Amino acid sequence: LDVVLGFESVLNPPAHLQRQYLFSDSMACVVRQGHPLISKPPSLEEFVAVPHMLISRTGSNIGIIDQKLTELGLERRIKLIVPHFLSAPLIVAKTDMILSLPYRIAEQFMKFAPLSIFPVPIDLPEYDLCMIWHPLRDKDPAHQWLRDKITAICRNI
């Protein structure tokens, strides 16, 4: 494992690991083009009533949004959990599910799948995306090259 990319607040990495801030972002929702929810911004009740897809590398059915909904006494209908972002836009584009994800990633998905984007209808703080690695790899030229490439890519999304 060379690096881990993720939300620092979710990863909560040990203090001895190296980390680099990449960017801050907010959450957005994507649905297929023509989805009934895009005619107007959905209410919170409409949002939780529609089936959702969740991206979870661990398979957990509790995400950042679910934690906030629980505080509000609500629960969304998670119909499908996938372990990574790769298949998510293609599935959402062919179903009536909602996918909540970082806004910058949602914008990228819209370049290759027929999707519409809208804000998450709950108040969520912005989060920091970071890159984490073991300090033993800190001065490795190949590892430095990889980190530099990841940093450059993140600057452009």
Model-identified regions with their sequence ranges:
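Secondary-structure junction motif
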Residues: 7-9, 37-39, 51-72, 139-143, ...
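Alpha-helical segments flanking ligand/cofactor-binding loops in enzyme cores
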Residues: 20, 45, 89-90
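Hydrophobic hinge/microswitch elements
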Residues: 1, 7, 58-116
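A late-sequence structural motif
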Residues: 33, 39, 105, 115-157
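Structural motif corresponding to alpha-helix initiation and N-cap regions
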Residues: 15-16, 40-41, 85
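Short beta-strand-centered segments that line the small-molecule binding cleft or hinge
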Residues: 1-27, 31, 116-118
